[in-house]
């Protein structure tokens, strides 16, 4: 879908080019003399308003953000909005330790903000690890996808075992970005200046932030974070189970919809890191 001409005319925008997006789609436009970004939202109204509320909440915390300019406005059942253009260059992938330090600094900036409500439609990674529905779904698909189900079940049981003894009741949730990856950051002159993509922003356990920031391979992100804000043994014990839970959540949703894994999830589950401790044992093929 391309931007509706009537909307472009109403908001007096000139198209520059397509910017892409995973679920939400974006176009760079000219708003008067300034660059801006037009967004087509993937989600429903509640999700749109939630994410805009997050942007409003963190608006005064010192980074350039895709701040709302106009909208949101529904056109033929799809939501659109206009946002500030976030200037700067993406952070190099190989600069993981600095990215980890920036993540810790971001959490420090957000520490005293009011905690937002739960994200609409977000069940959370804990559900994958704690609810019997995950086991029932694996049982139901074992005959059709034996290799995948065996892989998923092995990692699910290992993650659950690793969480025994963790005192979840004493762990306080915080606002996390949820996708602190190089392509969602903007830097100028070696300094983090901008942050984008709040599709996964939500109140959650601190260690859920590392699911996509670490991904089982970027160990220096964790080390860089700890350089600024020390992580406890309990924090580190959650690192791998929560990463696996993120992967398994997507895998289980695909199983439920009848979507066959193309190998991506299986490859990610097999990745091992020194930070995994005892969970670094290889999967027994």
Model regions and ranges:
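Active-site acidic catalytic loop and adjacent metal/ATP-binding pocket
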Residues: 20-33, 37-38, 68, 160-210
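Juxta-kinase regulatory segment immediately upstream of eukaryotic protein kinase catalytic domains
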Residues: 1-15
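Residues forming the ATP-binding cleft of Hanks-type serine/threonine protein kinase domains
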Residues: 86
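Active-site activation/catalytic loop segments of kinase-like enzymes and analogous catalytic loops
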Residues: 206-230, 245-262
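ATP/Mg2+ or Mg2+-diphosphate-binding catalytic cores
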Residues: 128-144, 151, 250-285
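A conserved alpha-helical element in kinase catalytic cores
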Residues: 39-78, 90-105
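A cross-family kinase active-site recognition segment
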Residues: 91-150, 173
């Amino acid at each position: 879908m391309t931007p509706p001409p009537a909307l472009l005319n109403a908001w007096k925008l000139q198209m520059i080019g397509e910017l892409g997006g995973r679920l939400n789609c974006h176009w760079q436009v000219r708003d008067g003399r300034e660059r801006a970004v037009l967004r087509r939202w993937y989600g429903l109204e509640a999700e749109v308003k939630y994410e805009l509320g997050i942007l409003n909440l963190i608006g005064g915390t010192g980074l350039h953000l895709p701040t709302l300019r106009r909208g949101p406005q529904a056109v033929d059942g799809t939501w659109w909005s206009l946002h500030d253009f976030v200037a700067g260059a993406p952070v190099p992938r190989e600069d993981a330790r600095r990215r980890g330090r920036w993540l810790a600094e971001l959490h420090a900036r957000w520490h005293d903000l009011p905690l937002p409500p739960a994200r609409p439609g977000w069940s959370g990674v804990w559900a994958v690890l704690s609810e019997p529905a995950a086991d029932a779904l694996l049982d139901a698909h074992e005959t059709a996808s034996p290799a995948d189900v065996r892989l998923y079940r092995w990692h699910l049981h290992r993650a659950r075992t690793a969480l025994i003894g963790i005192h979840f009741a004493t762990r306080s949730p915080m606002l996390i970005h949820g996708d602190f990856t190089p392509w969602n950051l903007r830097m100028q002159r070696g300094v983090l200046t901008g942050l984008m993509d709040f599709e996964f922003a939500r109140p959650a356990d601190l260690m859920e932030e590392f699911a996509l920031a670490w991904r089982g391979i970027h160990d220096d992100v964790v080390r860089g974070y700890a350089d600024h804000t020390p992580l406890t043994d309990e924090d580190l014990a959650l690192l791998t189970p929560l990463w696996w839970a993120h992967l398994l959540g997507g895998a289980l949703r695909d199983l439920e919809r009848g979507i066959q894994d193309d190998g991506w999830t299986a490859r990610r589950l097999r990745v091992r890191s020194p930070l995994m401790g005892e969970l670094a044992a290889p999967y027994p093929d």
